């Protein structure tokens, strides 16, 4: 449906089950027809990641250009790009200013891949994303490929995007490459909220330790960017204190630039 058709597509699939491959198939179809593809990534950090990851398109003679608020826009490069990578907010801004020569490139997009389309349901950013997609459809009527790991209302999204049933896919947990096991752990709660954060972090590290020792990875969610930086620093110290080897993955840098993390 993605490579051989032109219909809009909505796909929901578990994390790491191949959504990036679906995006790349849509891009390949667009490039095959000499079109311009736009990939809308939810965060600036992911736009940088895609730029590095899609070097292989450059090797095939196609140009990839990232447009974000933290970079100086080169309108000529944007106009000549085969693949554009942008955040929802920057795409929103470009579509609002499409009449200006600086942002006229946005009206030449033939295919839009929306990553993490479930953000439509979020406060603030959801409204921006919805308005941006609607504006794009009015400006240049591109093919829309909407991807998400969690989309409970996939039929509603498909209906809004005019994606037919044969181009609407919902893959269950059986497609997850790694089994997901759920568990609830408790920790002792004290009177000091600051100390409680570290109690929770140590409990999380206790769970993660055996996986890290086997050269695995762990992802710890905290409530804010500031807490993320503190937890990362404390985790590094605690892991060193526990003598857990981590050198196999190379250097460990903290990406603490607010623009990079937003």
Where are these predicted regions, by residue range?
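Motif I (Walker A/P-loop) of helicase-class P-loop NTPases
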Residues: 19-28, 125-132
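Conserved motor-coupling elements within RecA-like helicase/translocase cores
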Residues: 71-85, 262
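Conserved pre-motif I regulatory segment
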Residues: 1-12
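Conserved SF1/SF2 helicase motif Ia
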Residues: 12, 26-50, 138-141
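SF2 helicase catalytic motif II
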Residues: 84, 88-92, 99-144
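Conserved C-terminal RecA-like helicase domain
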Residues: 39, 48-51, 55, 59-65, ...
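Conserved Walker A/P-loop ATP-binding site and its immediately adjacent core
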Residues: 20-21, 35-56, 90-92, 149-154, ...
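Conserved interdomain linker/interface between the two RecA-like ATPase lobes of SF2 helicase motors
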Residues: 134, 142-239
